[in-house]
Amino acid sequence: MNAPAKPNDYSAYPDAEGRFGGFGGRYVAETLMPLVLDLGKAYADAKADPEFQAQLKSYNTHYAGRPSPLYFAERLTEHFGGAKIYFKRDELNHTGSHKINNALGQILLAMRMGKTRIIAETGAGQHGVATATVCARFGLPCVVYMGATDVERQKPNVFRMNLLGAEVRPVSSGTGTLKDAMNEAMRDWVTNVHDTYYLIGTAAGPHPYPVMVRDFQSVIGAEAREQILEMEGRLPDAVVACIGGGSNAIGLFHPFLGDEGVRLIGVEAAGHGVSTDKHAASLTGGRPGVLHGNRTYLLQDDDGQIIDAHSISAGLDYPGIGPEHSFLHDIGRAEYVSTTDTEALEAFKLCSTLEGIIPALEPAHALARVGEIAQELGKGKIVVMNLCGRGDKDIFTVAEALGRKI
């Protein structure tokens, strides 16, 4: 089967049905279809409304703290001895990750639609914290579904969500991780369609969620593009981001899609290795199927049953990926590689000791490949990596992995 040709105009995607080529779409229960269609119309209206956009920009600036800096990682650049490495510092946002960008956009949309109750799913807890934060800011009740496994390994974020007034509901079905939390959130949504808004955190789910999340996260790439032009006088040779569902990556990639000279590189979680059954690399080791309302690459067995994903990083522990990433993979516009748990831990330590920045385990996966990419590109070239979250939430996981007690 030949890969589809690259389009001349990426703005043509998704189509009216939310399809990126053969991916995306709206695969939802009959009871949800009217709500999903209403959401699509409401988002299209909001996107075209200058007042909504101005309101979002104001909150991004004065509440979230945007723009985030673009930082030259001088010591890491010297360490690897190749291209100049820049970090897009989205871990400096309010709440400590890129998740606030999307949470702000969607809460404003939910209020515009007259919704009075917010639900969300979370893996690492960062999206849960961001959702609880905006619900506290705007005075809306918040329920966050979180896998029981993730509740245990992300206790600081569970406490933060509770402190912000959210109710955290542990989900013990399956492996008790992000997929299972999303399943429970979808069930809640079906039951409470009239007053409840489901604030999805990743660039997946039924249309219009993948495009909404992409648009709200594209502030990352838009800022990075402007900042690197100001600092270096040209575009980077590569931009790199970690990928679970793919929201931070598509946010970085999208403003560079039309710049064919810029390589787009996504880094999946290889867990114990992609040759084992303990990984979360759905593009590397999966095939197309339908999950959580959209068609995309998924980890599945010969019978089409979803295989449980594994990663040391709770935010990458998902058996699928956003449909736009599946599309970019198939047309060859973006490249996707992977990083094991062990490699991510080494990168976590390296960034901490060389740059004085403790990254989240999610972007540590990207950093583990950035050194090789910088060496491959060579001196005089530029690579920009999205440092999408800070590592406070991961210190217990890292300490346990390193055999240390806190």
Swiss-Prot record:
GO molecular function: tryptophan synthase activity
UniProt GO cellular component terms: cytoplasm
Pfam families: PALP
Main function: The beta subunit is responsible for the synthesis of L-tryptophan from indole and L-serine.
Named cofactor requirement(s): pyridoxal 5'-phosphate
Keywords assigned: Amino-acid biosynthesis, Aromatic amino acid biosynthesis, Lyase, Pyridoxal phosphate, Tryptophan biosynthesis
Modified positions (N6-(pyridoxal phosphate)lysine) in chain numbering: 99
The protein's name in its UniProt record: Tryptophan synthase beta chain
Organism: Caulobacter vibrioides (strain ATCC 19089 / CIP 103742 / CB 15) (Caulobacter crescentus)
Top-tier EC class: lyase
Pathway terms, separated by semicolons: Amino-acid biosynthesis; L-tryptophan biosynthesis; L-tryptophan from chorismate: step 5/5
